[in-house]
């Protein structure tokens, strides 16, 4: 078993979604002994938030399985270039697309650019997100509410709506949700609401697209060490992050790749409308 850190040094970042290169320790995004088995060979995957965190881990794992990758990210260019470099070392293509996933026009352009430059689209991973803790609903402005929903939920709606113009039977859509809509979080009210919307969207789109042979599933991470954490919380909160899980530590991005590879591959051909929980041992109900 890998020896992942149970405690994190106190640290914080001033802007979201955060910079992976500034984190200490660096998130673990790759199993060095992971050997791909061509599970995604010849396929094209578009991954939002693919520059860092869980998105980086998924990008690298998909590359090892033979997929060409389009990474959609906001403006963390250094992280994106580092991920692209690692992806291309696997002998596949990697396209970087920077912009605001909360805008429908950009989402349409991202899908079209992926199809044009990589030759198609087989896998959509809706992974981008942001969060802004507040002590009370009274502290959540309309601007924050709209911004959080645009990034977390509207982006998934826009990208899915456009992607189905190109997705063929056997294709997969994977949405990143969270443990929060299952257990609640009184300081992340708007964020948790977006994740609840994603859960409903996943199930509904699974029903809507099953006739087209397109599977739609989700992954619900627990407390995971990604750039969003130091970019969200004060340093004293970061120092305790993840220690309240049964495993007593935060998860690492790499610990999700098995789920995302499974849901993208033919190994999950009889799964749709489902959510896989990666949360360090917390039991939740659906």
From Swiss-Prot:
Binding site for substrate: 178
Induction pattern: By heat shock, salt stress, oxidative stress, glucose limitation and oxygen limitation.
Alphabetical list of CDD domains matching this protein: SDR_c1
Matching InterPro entries: NAD(P)-bd_dom_sf, Sc_DH/Rdtase_CS, SDR_fam
Positions annotated as active site in the UniProt record: 191 (proton acceptor)
Keywords, comma-separated and alphabetical: Oxidoreductase, Stress response
Gene3D superfamilies: NAD(P)-binding Rossmann-like Domain
Gene Ontology MF terms in the entry: oxidoreductase activity, acting on CH-OH group of donors
UniProt-annotated stretches for the region Disordered: 1-26
Residues where NAD(+) binds: 46-70
Documented EC number(s): 1.-.-.-
Alphabetized Pfam families for the sequence: adh_short_C2
Family designation: Belongs to the short-chain dehydrogenases/reductases (SDR) family.
Stated name of the protein: General stress protein 39
Organism: Bacillus subtilis (strain 168)
Chain's gene name: ydaD
